[in-house]
Design a protein with these regions (language model features):
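A short, N-terminal "cap"/entry segment at the start of jelly-roll beta-barrel domains
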Residues: 1-42, 126-146
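A generic "binding-loop/recognition-motif" signal
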Residues: 25, 62-63, 81, 97-98, ...
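Conserved short histidine dyad/triad with adjacent acidic residue
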Residues: 31, 45-60
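A short hydrophobic beta-strand segment most commonly corresponding to one strand
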Residues: 46-47, 92, 107-123
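Well-ordered beta-strand scaffold positions
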Residues: 47, 73, 81-83
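Short beta-strand His + acidic residue motifs that chelate non-heme Fe in jelly-roll/DSBH
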Residues: 56-58, 76-77, 93, 99-105
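Glycine- and acidic-residue-biased ligand/ion/polar-headgroup-sensing regions
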Residues: 62-65, 69-74, 79
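Short acidic-glycine-tyrosine-enriched beta hairpin
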Residues: 80-95
Length: 146
């Protein structure tokens, strides 16, 4: 017998807050869920890489990071091993793995990025510069592209 009812948190792309962590970064992150929204130690965001864009080399002490490629193509490097990635691929980066995600395609690269536990990732994102999602971003997130 169910004794409680939990109402899920539902968001749409127009609700997402997007940031560029550093002014010179060539990727943006649109927060879908984070500890402040989900009351759980996770960060879920859509990461948008401009043509030629990439993350700086980074690693996490405790967190796993998963990337699901929504659109585009690129290259992922973790601890010196490089693989090509494209729409539909999933990539799981273990804790302590030094990694880079890079857009090698002719258009933007979009990933659904999930980090568990949060390990201050959401706070890092929110400390950056707020940016707007443009029409191309909204079309991808709203599944309005072919």
């Amino acid at each position: 017998m169910i004794n409680s009812c939990v109402i899920p948190v539902i968001k749409s792309p127009s609700d997402y807050q997007a940031y560029r962590i550093s002014p010179d970064d060539s990727n943006r992150l649109a927060i879908v869920f984070d500890p402040a929204i989900a009351n759980s130690s996770l960060t879920c965001c859509v990461e948008i890489f401009d043509v030629g864009g990439k993350t700086p080399p980074n690693r996490h002490l405790f967190a796993l990071e998963m990337f699901f490629i929504l659109k585009g193509e690129g290259r992922a490097t973790c601890d010196g091993k490089t693989v090509n990635i494209k729409a539909g691929d999933s990539l799981l980066v273990p804790a302590t793995g030094t990694h880079i995600i890079e857009n090698t395609g002719s258009g933007r690269l979009y990933t659904l990025t999930i980090m568990v536990p949060n390990e201050d990732f959401a706070e890092l994102i929110r400390s950056g510069t707020p940016v707007e999602l443009d029409a191309e971003d909204m079309a991808v997130l709203g599944r309005q592209y072919q």
